[in-house]
Structures are given as C-alpha cells and as structure tokens.
Design a protein with these regions (language model features):
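Extracellular loop-to-transmembrane helix junctions
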Residues: 6, 35-61, 145-146, 394-398
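Loop-to-transmembrane helix boundary motifs in multi-pass membrane proteins
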Residues: 7, 13-15, 21, 143, ...
C-alpha cells in the first residue's frame, strides 16, 4: 500500500465528488426529454431498475479496483493483475478515454460560462426567438471567443486540482455541489409555480404506460438502459481514482447507492425545472444543446425576472459541467503522478498545456473545420469525439472492468467481494455472482452493438 496516498478528509467529500463526476450535462439535456417521451414516471421506474442492476455493480467494481490497488487507472491493473497477463492494457484505454472526454467537455463547459455572462449582461433582453437562436450560432462561428472560454474552463479546473485533494478538489467541489442543489431547488420552485405548469408536472411525473407502449417497449428499455449506463461515467476509470482515496471503513455498495441516489435526484429535479416551464410557455422541450442554449433562454426571456433565473440556471449548468471536469482532471493529473512519479504541480502544468491543445479540434470543428463531417453530413469533430468515448470506450471499458473482477484469469470474484465488502454498511449480494459473470457482460455488449445500430443503421 502507498503510504503517501492522499485521502479524502470525509466520507461526504468522497460521495459528493463521485456524484459530481457522475452528474453531467446528460442529466439535464437528455434525461428530462426521454422521461417525458417514454411515459414519465413509468420510464423512471424502468430506469431505476437498470441503474441498480447495470450501473451500480460496475461502479462498485471500479471503486474496488481503485481502493485495492491504491492507484489511478494508469497503474491499478498493473498492481492487481495475475503475473504474465495483459489486463494493464485496459489502463491505457482508460487514460485515453479521460483525455478524449475532456477534448470536447471543456468546450461545452466554456459555453456554459459564456452564457452565464450573456445572461448577467442582459444580452437576450428584447430578442425574438430566432435572434436568441442566432446568439448560439454566432458563438459557434467565433473560434477566438470559444477558445477563450475553453481556456478559462481548463484553467479553473486545473487550478482547483493544483491546490491538492483535500484543500482543492474536495473543499471546492463540496461548496460547488451544495450551491448546485440550492440553485436547482430554487429553479424547481420557480418552474412548478409558473401559471400553466401543472400540465407539464402531470406529463413528467404521472406514469403513462400508454405512451410507453406507443413508443415501443424495446425502445423504452434500451433508452432506460443507455441512460442508466451513461449517466455514471463508467468504464474509463474516472470513478476508480476516488476509490483509491478512501479508507476501508465503509463497504462500497452503500457508498455507491448514495452516489446513484444523488445523480438520480439531480436528473429528476432538472426535469421539474425544464418540463413544467416548457409547458407553461407552450414550447416543445426537445433535448441536447438546442434545449439549453435556445429553448430555455427564450423561456427566461418571457419570464418575470427572467434574467436572474437565466443566470442562475447557467450557473447551475456550469457547476454540473465543472464538477465532472474537476473529477476527470484529478484522474488525468494522477496518471502522470502514478506513471512518472511527478509532483502534483508539474503534472498540472503539463496537462494544462496538453488539454488546451487537444481541445482545439473540437472548437475549430464548429467553424474553420466545419466542412469536415466525420460521421456523415452535419456531424462535427465533437460528434466524433463523443462517439469514440460514449459508443466505444465507456461500454468496452466497463466490460473489461467487469471481466477483470469476475474472471479467474483476472483479479477474480473472491478478491473483488472481499474489497467491496470491507468496512461497515451494505454488502454486495454474493448471490449475484452468476448474473455478474454471465448475464451483465451480455447486457453491456447489447448496449455496445445497439449504439452502433442506432448511429449507422436506424
């Protein structure tokens, strides 16, 4: 065991930071939309089922590998793999996944910060709906402006990490996550008290099995599976690092349950902000960047004190993006520290330069390189980077973590259970061995294959 390993100062720090890593933009711009589309609370029940049987076991395995090895993904497999095996190659894929994720996430984080400023300075006041959409298009067309905000995002993230695990990452993420919840609750109260919001609340929360059947049960199940899987940032070792920073006082199943509960709470509350507000103003919610950067600014424009609520919303979105960015930057820094024995400050300086350079193709893909459509007409560099991470590295990485923890040729089931169950709290059900070894890998392979099918053949 590494005696110099940094530690979280509290259990709350570990739970909030891990939840911060999981809570990302998909909680806001995808979850409310698919929940409304696929039957409201009926869909949420299916989603929660898959969160428990699909997302949680893999997260527990990632934490176990991190805690047992006391290393980041770069070295954890080296420490735990049986001699002569090649499991450590998974670590290099995980490292690539963290860098690739940040190659486009930093740009989107920059958009959020830019929109906080736009809201505070009243840039949207008096604009028509088309003009509001034009603000976003205009931003995408300016490589210099987007680069500046991307660099600000990178510098904020690495500055927090440079202060150290307890004084930086833990202390600042705790404050940020607390503010995120307070702002989210305030936005919720405002949204559900808008005139005409009741219809939206009913659409979002009342189970509608007819809507579910209409959409097709297979499609609903796959959407729930995908959301449960992708919401937790699994498969690239992003969670594993936080396992290496905690003691063996608590079992990992109970901690994972708390993290998943926080992630789901944010997703559900985000829906209570968005869906009732869209219904109140008779606007189709939609999903993705269009929802956040065009639909919602139009709603804030029509709302009393809309400038204030709009600014609060984009501060909330900035915190959601930055909590993930800081968590992944902590991973990226720890790779250099584990592999080359660097000091934290040196790892920070090296990676600031690396991430800024690596983030440029995403920025330029919206303007100077917009003719480059890697995944077919209308696609961008960002779509390609997202596809590599979401459709390939996350499912395949999760599959490798799973096989490593269940196969006798890897770390093995007994070692995994011993680690996961160390400490007080909820234990991992040993009866799930057959399910985890034989059925769960097939579910992940199904998600992987269906991702390709939807992308290229649907």
């Amino acid at each position: 065991m590494d005696e110099q390993r940094e530690r979280f100062s509290s259990r709350l720090g570990f739970i909030l930071i891990s939840a911060g890593c999981a809570i990302g933009l998909g909680n806001v711009w995808r979850f409310p939309y698919i929940t409304g589309q696929y039957g409201g609370a009926a869909f949420v029940l299916v989603y929660l089922l898959f969160l428990v049987i699909l997302g949680m076991p893999i997260m527990i395995m990632e934490f176990s590998v991190g805690r047992a090895s006391q290393k980041s993904a770069a070295k954890s497999f080296h420490v735990l793999e049986p001699k002569g095996t090649k499991w450590h190659l998974t670590g290099y894929a995980a490292m690539a996944g963290n860098y690739l994720l940040m190659m486009f996430y930093t740009t989107v984080g920059g958009w959020m910060l830019a929109y906080v400023m736009k809201m505070l300075t009243g840039e949207f006041v008096g604009l028509t709906p088309d003009e509001v959409g034009g603000v976003f298009d205009n931003m995408l067309a300016q490589p210099g402006y987007m680069t500046a905000w991307m660099i600000v995002t990178v510098l904020i993230g690495f500055f927090v990490c440079s202060l150290g695990l307890q004084k930086g990452v833990e202390r600042i993420t705790k404050v940020m996550m607390s503010c995120l919840f307070i702002i989210l609750l305030a936005l919720c109260i405002r949204s559900i008290t808008l005139p005409g919001a009741g219809e939206g609340i009913a659409f979002y929360l009342i189970p509608d099995f007819h809507r579910m059947v209409e959409a097709g049960l297979g499609e609903v199940i796959f959407a729930a599976m995908g959301q449960a899987f992708f919401t937790l940032s699994l498969g690239i070792g992003a969670m594993s690092i936080f396992g290496s920073y905690i003691s063996k006082d608590r079992s990992l199943t109970g901690e994972t349950l708390s993290i998943c509960a926080l992630d789901t709470t944010v997703a559900l509350l985000a829906g209570l902000v968005i869906i009732p507000a869209c219904f109140a103003f008779g606007i189709d919610a939609g999903q993705g960047p269009g929802l956040v950067f065009v639909t919602l600014p139009n709603i804030f424009n029509q709302m009393a004190a809309g400038q204030l609520w709009g600014a609060l919303f984009f501060i909330f979105m900035s915190f959601a993006a930055l909590s993930t960015i800081i968590a992944v930057f902590e991973n990226i820094i720890s790779f250099a520290m584990d592999l080359w024995g660097w000091e934290r400050k040196k790892a920070v300086v090296f990676n600031v330069i690396m991430i800024i350079i690596l983030s440029m193709p995403c920025v330029l893909g919206f303007n100077l390189w917009s003719d480059f459509a890697p995944l077919g007409a209308g696609s961008t560099v960002q779509d390609l980077e997202d596809f590599i991470v979401s459709n390939n590295l996350l499912p395949l990485g999760s599959l490798l973590y799973l096989l490593f923890c269940t196969s006798k040729h890897g770390w093995g089931w007994d070692n995994f259970i011993t680690e996961a169950d160390s400490g007080e709290g909820l234990k991992f059900p040993k009866a799930l061995r057959f399910y985890c070894t034989y059925i769960l890998p097939l579910i992940i392979l199904f998600i992987f294959v269906m991702g390709y099918w939807q992308k290229f053949f649907d």
